[in-house]
Structures are given as C-alpha cells and as structure tokens.
C-alpha cells in the first residue's frame, strides 16, 4: 500500500506542496507505507523526508487514488514562490504550487480530483 500527501497551507487557500523527483518530474510527496504504519503516520514521515516539512494530518481518503490513501495535511509555514532543497537525494526541489506544474509525473485530472475533493466526506483525523 502507498500513501500520497496532499499538503496544503493553513495560511493561504489554494496552495499545496509538490516535489520534483529527479527521474519522474513533479509529483505529490508520498511513498510506500511501512509494516504496521498507519496511513497518516506514513504521510507525515514521507512529507518530512521529501519536503522537510511538518504538518498536522487532518483527513484520509482511500477512494481518490487506486491502491493507495491520500492524506490531507495542513502545514503552518509561510507560502513562498521560492523552491527549497530536499534532504532526499532523489528529490531535486520542493515548492508551493497554485497550479499543476509542467513536467508533472501526475496527470492533471488526478490532481484536479484531489483539489476538488470534498474532504468533509473523508475520514477525519481530528483537529
């Protein structure tokens, strides 16, 4: 099972984090879940490993992407147009996005499905 992180700004609407994988291009942070690891734990771990960011897992949805979980994570750091470096050697850069970047490993339809998802219908992880 894998997890995808929908990391959004708690300060500004419409901003989310993507990472630029050296071989695949721009994608949402995420990866394989460890044995016994809950989706929200895996999401927070992957977000930190790939983007160097900490956040609060708010909700989870297992129907958005086939074979995986999407975890909504709120991040309370300033939104900036400037990219930053990742601690993960496979990640070229990290940045806040307002639209799906060119050279995206994800199809625009997949991202739009997540952008437009009504998280109130998902499993809440508390406040």
Name the predicted role of every residue range.
Residues 33-127:
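Unchanged
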Residues 11-12, 20-25, 64-66:
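Short, flexible beta-strand-to-coil junctions
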Residues 5-7, 25, 54-55, 61:
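Glycine-centered flexibility motif
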Residues 17-18, 72:
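Short, hydrophobic/aromatic-rich beta-strand segments within well-structured domains
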Residues 27-31:
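A short gly/proline-enriched turn/hairpin at secondary-structure junctions
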Residues 1-16:
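Conserved N-terminal beta-strand and adjoining loop/helix that marks the start
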């Amino acid at each position: 099972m894998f997890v995808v992180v929908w990391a959004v700004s708690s300060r500004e609407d419409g901003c989310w984090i993507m990472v630029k994988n050296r071989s695949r291009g721009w994608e949402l942070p995420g990866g394989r879940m460890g044995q016994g690891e809950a989706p929200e734990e895996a999401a927070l771990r992957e977000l930190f490993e790939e983007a160097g960011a900490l956040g609060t897992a708010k909700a989870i949805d297992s129907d958005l992407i086939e074979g995986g979980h999407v975890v909504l994570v709120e991040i309370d750091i300033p939104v900036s147009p400037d990219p930053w470096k990742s601690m993960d050697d496979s990640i070229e850069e990290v940045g806040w996005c307002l639209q799906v970047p060119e050279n995206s490993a994800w199809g625009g339809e997949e991202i739009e499905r997540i952008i437009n998802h009504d998280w109130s219908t998902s499993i809440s992880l508390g406040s």
